[in-house]
């Protein structure tokens, strides 16, 4: 957890994760959370972020492979921009992370066996935590609703 700035850890705690925040952490920028209406808004946000970042390695993380492929097909390829699923990002760290594809439809399972639903919710909550902790300096969270609302449903 020490890779993250104080602001990133405070954000993770504020959206509903029970983590302890140590002393003497690096100070950084506030987490950027953007509520978007559709894929076009998401693409605009990501294009602006990509244009601003020339030096830092940026990880754009999705839950599904389909969305990862979609973003790869729509966004300019730059050496420092990595688009991948959260699963693919496990064990990797980035200067900047942008977590995308945040919606209840994607992360909160329904219409399934109750035990399976509980297990999927736990796994998805863990996945979101993994995504959030990949960021060393800057974190962007982009979705159709706030991350807190999604985590509270898991």
Task: Tell me what each language-model feature is.
Residues 1-37:
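Conserved coupling/interface region of RecA-like P-loop/ASCE motor cores
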Residues 7, 69-71, 149-150:
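Phosphate- and divalent-cation-binding pockets in alpha/beta enzyme and binding domains
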Residues 8, 91, 131:
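Hydrophobic, well-ordered secondary-structure elements that form the walls
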Residues 28-31, 79, 93-96, 135-138:
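Short glycine-/polar-rich loops that comprise or flank the Walker A/P-loop
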Residues 36, 84-86, 142-144:
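Conserved beta-strand termini and adjacent loop/short-helix elements that scaffold enzyme active sites
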Residues 40-114, 118, 127:
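Conserved helicase/translocase motor-coupling segment
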Residues 103-154:
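C-terminal accessory regions
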């Amino acid at each position: 957890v020490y890779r993250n700035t104080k602001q990133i850890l405070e954000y993770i705690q504020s959206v509903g994760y029970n983590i302890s925040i140590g002393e003497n952490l690096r100070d950084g920028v506030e987490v950027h959370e953007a509520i978007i209406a559709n894929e076009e808004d998401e693409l605009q946000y990501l294009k602006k972020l990509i244009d601003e970042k020339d030096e830092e390695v940026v990880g754009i993380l999705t839950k599904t492979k389909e969305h990862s492929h979609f973003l790869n097909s729509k966004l300019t390829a730059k050496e420092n921009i990595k688009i991948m699923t959260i699963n693919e990002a496990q064990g990797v760290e980035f200067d900047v992370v942008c977590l995308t594809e945040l919606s209840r439809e994607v992360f909160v399972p329904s219409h399934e066996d109750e035990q399976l639903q509980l297990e999927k919710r736990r796994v998805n909550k863990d996945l979101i935590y993994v995504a959030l902790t990949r960021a060393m300096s800057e974190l962007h969270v982009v979705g159709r609703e706030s991350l807190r609302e999604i985590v509270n449903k898991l």
